[in-house]
Amino acid sequence: MGQKIHPTGFRLAVSRNWASRWYANNNNFAAMLQEDIGVREYLKKKLKNASVGRVVIERPAKNARITIFSSRPGVVIGKKGEDIELLKSELQKRMGVPVHVNIEEIRKPETDAQLIADSITQQLERRIMFRRAMKRAMQNAMRLGAQGIKIMSAGRLNGIEIARTEWYREGRVPLHTLRADIDYATSEAKTTYGIIGVKVWVYKGDTLGRNDAPVVEEVAEEKRPRRNARPGGDRRPRRDGEGGGPAGARRGAPRRAGGAGGDGKTGE
């Protein structure tokens, strides 16, 4: 009870795309997947100060193409491209195939879920109050165009002995609307009291397709007529004897007990 489905996995092939895009047979699939996980962990440690949001790995025809989304591309590239060349050579050793590295800039890091989660965990490790860090991140995201944001922190918050979970939400975050563009990410803060987990949901509006098609406004449904409404607007005239009473009798008027004599007997 109370558990939420992973927003990215729920929307795969509907409004989200995979982070690893390649095909493999049954023999190579596990090894290639493990290789992707190792590459992402290596890049996360290597580019810890570069504010990396996500890494997309593609494998076209015995090559590898890695796209790094970062809010600080200058840190990744380095002076005269030295750092990125070293990074490319290290990745080629790990993957065993020619590697092409592309850098994409994140224009609004305040609305990127992974960067928000990493920022909060870094503040928690510096002993900043978790409520202050969460609310500041929510205010920045809403100010820069997010339609809704929800942040959850779990663990020994403020060093208390009993772990608990606290979450805050601003705006709307429709988790079960498939066309809703929900950016979801997690991060962990390693504090002296233990690990504090942070989850972030950011609602950026509705999309059609895989984050590239615009939203088409829904056409308002025509008002359906009532079942007893007639084209002319007037009700059908009532026929004599309809409704169970004598002709011309008003609804609710008392019925006479007998026939014409009114004594309850007939034919006498």
Curated annotation (Swiss-Prot):
**Lineage: superkingdom:** Bacteria
What ranges does the record give for the region Disordered, renumbered to this chain? 216-268
One Gene Ontology CC term in the entry: cytosolic small ribosomal subunit
Any GO BP: translation
The protein's matches in Gene3D superfamilies, at most eight in alphabetical order, are given as:
3.30.300.20, Ribosomal protein S3, C-terminal domain
Q: Where is the composition biased (Gly residues)?
A: 258-268
Q: Where is the KH type-2 domain?
A: 39-107
UniProt KW keywords: Ribonucleoprotein, Ribosomal protein, RNA-binding, rRNA-binding
Identify the InterPro entries for this entry.
Answer: KH_dom, KH_dom-like_a/b, KH_dom_type_2, KH_sf_prok-type, Ribosomal_S3_C_sf, Ribosomal_uS3_bac-typ, Ribosomal_uS3_C, Ribosomal_uS3_CS
- Summarize subunit and interaction data from the UniProt record for this chain: Part of the 30S ribosomal subunit. Forms a tight complex with proteins S10 and S14.
Q: Can you name this protein?
A: Small ribosomal subunit protein uS3
- The protein's gene is named rpsC
